[in-house]
Amino acid sequence: MLDTLVPGAPVLVAGGGVTGRAVLAALTRFGMAATLCDDDPAALQQYADNGVATVSAATATQQMFERGRKYVLVVTSPGFAPTTPVLVAASAARVPIWGDVELAWRLDAAGYYGPPRRWLVVTGTNGKTTTTSMLHAMLAADNRRSLLCGNIGRPVLDVLTEFAEPSDFLAVELSSFQLHWAPSLRPEAGVVLNIAEDHLDWHSTMADYTMAKARVLTGRVAVVGLDDSRAAALLSTTVAPVRVGFRFGEPAVGELGVRDGYLVDRAFAEDLALMPVTSIPVSGPVGVLDALAAAALARSVGVGATAIADAVALFRLGRHRAEVVAVADGIRYVDDSKATNPHAALVSVLAYPRVVWVAGGLLKGASVDAEVARMAPQLVGAVLIGRDRAMVAEALSRHAPNVPVVQVVAGEDAGMHAVAVVSGTDVISISDVGGTIGTRVMVAAVAAARDLAQPGDTVLLAPAGASFDQFSGYADRGDTFATAVRAAIR
C-alpha cells in the first residue's frame, strides 16, 4: 500500500499552508526526503530558514520533464486544482499524486500510527460541518473514542500525529477537493448529504464534482440523502455492501426518516425511535436531515439511541451558521456567512417568512437561477455585494422582478475609500467610513438592508458565494456583518 514510501524516498509537497505543514511533518517523521514547492517566495523562505528543502513551483514543474525521476510521489494541498502546472507536469511524467487525506489514509491503514482507526466520513455541498460535529458528539456520548478532523479545521495527519492514544474512530469532514486527491479511501462508513453546483471553477464538470463526492461511498456502509436527487442516484452505483438512505419523510425499510414527530431508524433496527424532532436545536428541515445523516453513521457502528438523543439535544451550531446577531425595532439580523454556495443560501432563506437577503461574493462558476426562483416568495428585498453580484441581480430580475434590489459597488483596489450604493442604475449614496474594503462594503450593505426591512422581517446574510474577493474568509465576512449591524442599531 505504501510501495513508494520508503526511508529516503524523494517526495514533493505542493503547497506550504496548513496542509503542507502537516504533510511535511508526517513525511519527515517516517524518514522520507520531502521537498516543498510553492509559488510564494516568502513562504518558501520561511520553510528554508527552518531547514526544509524548498523549490519554486516553476522549478518543480520543470524538474518533472528532466531525465530520470526526481520525485517518486507528489503530495498536494487540496486547493491545488488538477490544472495547476506542477500537477499537470507530474501527471504527464506519471508521478503519482496524492492529497493529504490519501497519505493519512494509507499511513493509518498500514499501521504507522498503531491500530488503524475506523473512518466515518461526511461530505456534501452543504451541512458537512454540522453533521460531522453531531456525529462526533454521538460517538462521545456512547463512550467511543473519537477524533474530529478533516475539512472541519484539523488536518487528519495532525490529529493522527498529535494524539498518543489511538482513537477508535475518526469523524472526518471531507471536501470535494480532498476527495479528488484520495482515490484509495475506503471508509468504514460514509455519507453524501446532498450535491448542488459548487466549485465548478475547480472541477472541470459537474460529473467530476459528483464523482469526487461519491468516493466516501466505497467502504462497508454507504449513506445518501434521498431528498436530493443527485445524492440519491449514487446509492444504485455504490459497491458498498450496506446501502442506507435518509429522508425528511417516513422511512422505508433500509432508511432513516421522520414518523409521528420522531426520528426513526429502519436501517439498523426493525423500527427504532431515536428522538423527538422537537429536541433538535437546529431549526427547520435542514437540522432534521443533518441529525438523520449523523445518526445513520453512528448507528452503522452500533451507537445507541439514548446516546444519539443526548448528543443532539446538547448540540449547538458553530459560529456564522444561522447565528442571530441582533434584534432591533422588530427586525432580526442573522449571520449565515457559512452559506457559501447557492444551495446553502436557498436553505437559509427558506427558513424565514420575510427576508431582506444580503448576498454575493465569488460564485465559483455556479448558477443561482434555480435557487432564486425557489426563494423568490420569501424575499422582500435584496442587497448585493461582491464581485459576482451582477449575476445574482440578473437572476433576481428574471425570477423576482418586484423585489427591490440594491447593489453595493466597490472597486477592486483595496485602497479605494468610496463605496457606491446603487439602486437600479442610479447611485443613491456614497459612503466613506474608513477601514478595509470589506468593512466599508458591509456598513453600506447593512444600512441599505435596514432601509428595506420592516418589523417582522429578517435581514439575512446568506451570501451564496465565497468571501475572498472582499474578506479574508467567511468568518471575517460574518464578523464584519455583525459589527456593522451592532453599530447601526446603537
UniProtKB/Swiss-Prot annotation:
- What's its EC? 6.3.2.9
Instruction: Note the superkingdom of the native organism.
Output: Bacteria
List keywords of the entry alphabetically. ATP-binding, Cell cycle, Cell division, Cell shape, Cell wall biogenesis/degradation, Cytoplasm, Ligase, Nucleotide-binding, Peptidoglycan synthesis
One GO cellular component this record assigns the protein to is: cytoplasm
Can you provide one Gene Ontology molecular function annotated for this UniProt record?
UDP-N-acetylmuramoylalanine-D-glutamate ligase activity
Q: Which InterPro entries match?
A: Mur-like_cat_sf, Mur_ligase_C_dom_sf, Mur_ligase_cen, MurD
Pathway as given in its UniProt record: Cell wall biogenesis; peptidoglycan biosynthesis
Q: Which GO terms describe its biological process?
A: cell division; cell wall organization; peptidoglycan biosynthetic process; regulation of cell shape
Which sites bind ATP? 124-130
Using the UniProt record, give the first listed, main subcellular location.
Answer: cytoplasm
Query: Where does it localize?
Result: Cytoplasm
Pfam families in the cross-refs: Mur_ligase_M (PF08245)
Catalytic activities = UDP-N-acetyl-alpha-D-muramoyl-L-alanine + D-glutamate + ATP = UDP-N-acetyl-alpha-D-muramoyl-L-alanyl-D-glutamate + ADP + phosphate + H(+)
| Family in the record | Belongs to the MurCDEF family.
Role summary: Cell wall formation. Catalyzes the addition of glutamate to the nucleotide precursor UDP-N-acetylmuramoyl-L-alanine (UMA).
Q: What is this protein called?
A: UDP-N-acetylmuramoylalanine--D-glutamate ligase
